[in-house]
Amino acid sequence: MANNDTTGSAGRFGARYGRVARRRVAEIEADTESATVDGDSVKRVGTGIWVNEETGEKFTGGAYRPQTPAGETVERSIRTAVGDDE
């Protein structure tokens, strides 16, 4: 008997485009749907524009994720620099 696993959001592509491409699409869509920043849920408004659903604050981030890896590195560096000055 066949395995009845759920296909996820990229299941709409069927057997097309390859396994890796479908997996990347599924990961991006999962990150976009369940995006949080500091515990608050955020929603994607446009390319790189996100809005905090609880406070209404708009901010920029990555195209598909609210925080990019480079942005997280910069934020960590700023926290370290500010912590050293005090």
From Swiss-Prot:
One of its GO terms (biological process) is translation. One of its GO terms (molecular function) is structural constituent of ribosome. Residues 59-86 are annotated as: Disordered. GO terms for cellular component: ribonucleoprotein complex; ribosome. Keywords: Ribonucleoprotein, Ribosomal protein, RNA-binding, rRNA-binding. It holds the Pfam family Ribosomal_L37ae. Belongs to the eukaryotic ribosomal protein eL43 family. Binds to the 23S rRNA. Part of the 50S ribosomal subunit. This is Large ribosomal subunit protein eL43. It comes from Natronomonas pharaonis (strain ATCC 35678 / DSM 2160 / CIP 103997 / JCM 8858 / NBRC 14720 / NCIMB 2260 / Gabara) (Halobacterium pharaonis). The gene is rpl37ae.
